[in-house]
Amino acid sequence: MRQLALTLAASIFTLVAAPAMANTPDEALVIAQNIDDIVTIDPATAYEFSSGEYVTNTYDQLVQYDAVDTEVLAPGLATDWQIDAENRTITFTLRNGVTFHSGNPLRAEDVVESWRRVLVIDGRPAFILGNLGWTVDTFDSMVSGEGNTVIVRWSGDFAPSFVLNVLASRPASVVDIETVRAHEVDGDHGHAWLNQNSAGTGPFSLISYRPAEVLTLQRNPDYFAGTPTMEKILISHVAEASTQ
């Protein structure tokens, strides 16, 4: 899973460490990277390279790429899954005891409504979930969740392995839907709030974000795969590669 990444303190970021800033804590990793490509950090709409790295470190999916062998899918927020005999349905069992950065427990509703939110907002990465034949109109007939179970169906002649890869993608990230809805403004589905805050289960949570300047993360001590080594990560924008 992500244990290797946690041990290396967010080595998922393919970045270069910068000289330490004044008063930087010993357990903080300071990184210099060009982050002005970021348009949004809401996982429902994030589509750029840098925002994708951010999403990877703050959110989880039901299944995830193994940290050691990235061609292998491993359990994430789901501990296991069963494929029906006709290869048309996958039933996921959610991991017990997982909490969001807010402290709210992970529920099947969070999974289902996070995916629906992607389709409703219809940002650039929505087509990835749309590959499964999911639309705002078809979603309720294809995805359901109750208790610790999420059931997924799809249209098209896809192998279940393709479906699992879609569900391991960043737009399939699960958000704390209760918290997101509490911060909805003018029907934006919490989009503005998620551009300044995180609402995931990932190894790090967002402390602050100043576009094209700095993005600061802090470790999640309750992360289900183990507490990250580094207490904080500061990603400072540096435009020229030669100055990194």
Predicted regions and their residues:
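Bacterial N-terminal signal peptides
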Residues: 7-16
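Sec/Tat signal peptide C-region and signal peptidase I cleavage site
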Residues: 18-22
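Short, well-ordered beta-strand elements
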Residues: 26-35, 79, 89-91, 111-115, ...
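N-terminal lobe/hinge region of extracytoplasmic solute-binding protein
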Residues: 32-85, 116, 197-203
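Gly/Pro-rich hinge or "lid" segments in bacterial periplasmic/extracellular proteins
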Residues: 66-67, 168-228, 242
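Aromatic- and charge-enriched surface segment that lines or borders ligand/interaction sites
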Residues: 80-125, 151
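Surface-exposed binding/hinge segments that line
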Residues: 93, 131-183, 208
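Short helix-initiation/N-cap motifs at beta->coil->alpha
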Residues: 137, 199, 234-244
